[in-house]
């Protein structure tokens, strides 16, 4: 590629709405341009990187035995109504009507369409396992698109769907996809972690997210530095921090706490550790034709509620936070002084595992400006329902028993799910098994955010000059910067030969023949992030040398002109082989 025949749309300044590094640099490097909120044009530099990501994904999916197809972006509403997600999905699902008033959606995902394919095409267990995948544009009408390609409304995604005869076979399909994802993200050059995750609106029984480690990540990841354990904080099991309950050592007493509605303020006033206070959270579940059921969830004062875990407890699916009026009706006091002792109306109490092993703790007195200290289970309160309802914290014991947890931030770039029969049951996708009986197909689904990978890679690889691409997805692997290409025959001949030699070696090389000043050339390619640069100048050629500098190198080095192409080609190959 010659730069004079390519489009280079670099900018000196980032747009005012760009909040994170990847968004700023993708615009400045001429990769993307905004069309509307969360919708972007991908300019030639950006598209080259997208195509390289797609190529890696496609190679590894094919290697894992998946079969590529292409499904429509526009999907009929009937399929979503069959699955039940027409009502469940909410405003993120972009719905519209055609001229005949038929309802359609722009697909954010393709479980319904692929299940329709399977139920019409797969009839026997002999046709399974099968795994279909596609690389296609999706649309989710995010309420607040931000961070460039990180949370866009339109995006490119690889989605795959496996169909198996039973759950044991699904586990094998799932493992193949898990391993393929590890290979994909390793080849791209990410520092990443697969983490146990919640299935969310997709449904199913088991899932893993693949997170690129980055300080700007939206997700909190709990991991053990001394083992392989990693999980999304939403899904990580929180073990009790007390092995057993100590015997009571204090009498229960009512304590004045004027104006102290927060656990931190109560602990400071009483001169006790925050860990001895209880945080009371009130939830409600609605009952048709009757008053709601009110729940009091008890957490240690320094812990936070995990709503995803809570929603999985018996009776708490579809819960909501109680209104202030409901709190006053059931507890006799507004929030800030709530507790399980002396409620006006019966409430259901759930204690976190750590709270269940606490002694002599402090709770609200259900009276403004008062708390109760020295409270103990069994003596002052009946034994509670005990459940894991909190988020883990750094320093908590790892669930695998192999050390303590730490917390980092992650950007989700892939997700694999064991769906089971959720969609096949709803949509009648059955096959005939070995005994001649109809059985529901057992499904898995596996997604990778192609365009999000670009943003995640930049969040992990940048400096004050611009992007520092991993070789595998850089728009170009090598840039040639000739000094005076349009003025010096020697420079032009040397640059053209280097270009031809590198291209013949299979290297993705661009020759900057624009005639720009050295400072402009260097700034453009450092901003764009090309991993390897060769500078050809008359002075160096007289000594038989060409200047080489890797994008991560602090200083340039000199290479023999006659072997520079081979040396740089070997550097590229070595980087790609890592």
UniProtKB/Swiss-Prot annotation:
Catalytic reaction equation(s): tRNA(Pro) + L-proline + ATP = L-prolyl-tRNA(Pro) + AMP + diphosphate
This protein's record includes keyword Cytoplasm: yes
GO cellular component: cytosol
GO biological process terms held by the UniProt record: prolyl-tRNA aminoacylation
EC number, UniProt record: 6.1.1.15
Record carries keyword Cytoplasm: yes
Main localization (coarse): cytoplasm
Compartment(s) of residence: Cytoplasm
Disulfide bonds: none
Pfam families in UniProt: HGTP_anticodon, tRNA-synt_2b, tRNA_edit
Functional description taken from the UniProt entry: Catalyzes the attachment of proline to tRNA(Pro) in a two-step reaction: proline is first activated by ATP to form Pro-AMP and then transferred to the acceptor end of tRNA(Pro). As ProRS can inadvertently accommodate and process non-cognate amino acids such as alanine and cysteine, to avoid such errors it has two additional distinct editing activities against alanine. One activity is designated as 'pretransfer' editing and involves the tRNA(Pro)-independent hydrolysis of activated Ala-AMP.
Domain comment in the entry: Consists of three domains: the N-terminal catalytic domain, the editing domain and the C-terminal anticodon-binding domain.
Name of the protein: Proline--tRNA ligase
Organism expressing this protein natively: Burkholderia mallei (strain ATCC 23344)
């Amino acid at each position: 590629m010659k730069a004079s025949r390519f489009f280079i749309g670099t900018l000196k300044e980032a747009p005012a709405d760009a909040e994170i590094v990847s968004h700023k640099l993708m615009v400045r490097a001429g990769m993307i341009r905004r069309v509307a909120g969360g919708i972007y044009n991908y300019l030639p530099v950006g598209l080259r990187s997208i195509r390289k990501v797609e190529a890696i994904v496609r190679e590894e999916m094919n290697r894992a035995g998946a079969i590529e197809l292409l499904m429509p972006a526009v999907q009929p509403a009937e399929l979503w109504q069959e699955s039940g997600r027409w009502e469940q999905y909410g405003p993120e699902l972009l719905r519209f009507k055609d001229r005949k008033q038929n309802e359609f959606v722009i697909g954010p995902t393709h479980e319904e369409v692929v299940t329709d394919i399977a139920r019409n095409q797969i009839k026997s267990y002999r046709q399974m396992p099968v795994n279909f995948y596609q690389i296609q544009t999706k649309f989710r009408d995010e309420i607040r698109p931000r961070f460039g390609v990180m949370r866009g409304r339109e995006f490119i995604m690889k989605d795959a769907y496996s169909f198996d005869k039973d759950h044991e076979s699904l586990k094998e399909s799932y493992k193949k996809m898990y391993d393929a994802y590890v290979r994909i993200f390793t080849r791209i050059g990410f520092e990443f972690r697969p983490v146990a995750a919640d299935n969310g609106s997709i449904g199913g029984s088991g899932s893993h997210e693949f997170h690129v480690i980055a300080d700007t990540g939206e997700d909190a990841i709990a991991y053990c530095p001394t083992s392989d354990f990693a999980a999304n904080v939403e899904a990580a099991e929180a073990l009790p921090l007390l092995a057993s309950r100590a015997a009571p050592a204090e009498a229960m007493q009512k304590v004045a706490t004027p104006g102290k509605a927060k656990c931190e303020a109560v602990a400071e006033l009483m001169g006790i550790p925050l860990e001895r206070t209880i945080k009371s959270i009130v939830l409600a579940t609605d009952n048709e034709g009757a008053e709601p059921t009110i729940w009091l969830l008890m957490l240690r004062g320094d812990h936070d509620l995990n709503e995803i875990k809570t929603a999985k407890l018996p009776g708490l699916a579809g819960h909501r936070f109680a209104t202030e009026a409901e709190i006053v009706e059931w507890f006799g006091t507004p929030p800030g002084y709530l507790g399980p002792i002396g409620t006006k109306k019966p409430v259901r109490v759930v204690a976190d595992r750590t709270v269940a092993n606490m002694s002599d703790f402090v709770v609200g007195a259900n009276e403004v400006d008062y708390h109760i200290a020295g409270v103990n289970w069994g003596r002052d309160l009946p034994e509670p329902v005990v459940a894991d309802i909190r988020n883990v914290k750094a320093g908590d014991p790892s669930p695998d028993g192999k050390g303590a947890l730490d917390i980092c931030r992650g950007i989700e770039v892939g997700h694999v799910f064991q769906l089971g029969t959720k969609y096949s049951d709803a949509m009648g996708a059955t096959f005939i098994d070995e005994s001649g009986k109809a059985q529901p197909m057992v499904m898995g689904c596996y997604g990778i955010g192609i365009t999000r990978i670009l943003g995640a890679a930049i969040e992990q690889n940048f400096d004050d000059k611009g992007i520092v691409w991993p070789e595998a997805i850089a728009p170009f692997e090598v840039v040639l910067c000739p000094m005076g290409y349009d003025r010096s025959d020697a420079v032009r001949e040397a640059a053209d030969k280097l270009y031809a030699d590198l291209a013949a070696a299979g290297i993705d090389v661009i020759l900057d023949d624009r005639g720009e000043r050295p400072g402009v050339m260097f700034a453009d390619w450092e901003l764009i992030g090309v991993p390897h640069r060769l500078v050809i100048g008359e002075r160096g050629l007289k000594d038989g040398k060409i200047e080489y500098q890797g994008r991560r190198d602090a200083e340039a080095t000199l290479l023999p002109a006659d072997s520079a192409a081979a040396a740089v080609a070997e550097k590229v190959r070595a980087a790609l082989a890592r």
